[in-house]
Amino acid sequence: KTGIELEESSGVMAGPEYTESMGGTWYEGSVLSVAIGQESSQFTPIQLASYISTLVNGGTRKSTHLLKEIKSSDYSQIVETYEPEVLSTIEIQDKNLEAVKAGMLALTTDGSVRRYFQDLPVQVGAKTGSAQVSAQTESNAVFVCFAPYDDPEIALAMVVEHGGSGSELGAMAADILSYYFSTKGSMDEIPMENTLIR
């Protein structure tokens, strides 16, 4: 779980224990199926974004919150602040992390989604996914990314059920990042009228 202030189920990472608990059989080759989006892994978009954030910050998994802070109605004081807490840490060797990040950068600079990201003011690391559901329906389209590449501050995750290829979501992710970085720093300039939380 991510710690977000909503009802949330734990994600499922496919593996021998889970497969056998569901009455299935885990084979040595099953790990290859998991690596390409098959088998029984199940994660929410917020869990995927949390995973990407953990990966690119070097292995510290922090709680997710909807709000940064709550201010009094006259904006004179901060009533409550939400600080993320460390939920867990994972060990990632620098060379492995850099290899993963380099692969994610290559997707946006030389890969199937480069046309969407070439005009952004920052470099982006991303990964597409097409999680198979059944032979009768389109795969679930999955797209995760982080930016800026050298000093990450935002992670996105998108899932469209039966959306086909994850690369189809690249344009949407690029639009979100374009807006995010074009408005960066302007939040302090928003007038107080009609603004409840900042």
Positions of predicted regions on the chain:
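Short, conserved micro-motifs enriched in small and acidic residues
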Residues: 39-46, 163-171
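Beta-lactam-recognizing serine transpeptidase/beta-lactamase-like catalytic domain environment
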Residues: 1-158, 196-198
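Periplasmic/cell-envelope proteins involved in peptidoglycan metabolism and beta-lactam response
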Residues: 119, 126, 159, 167-198
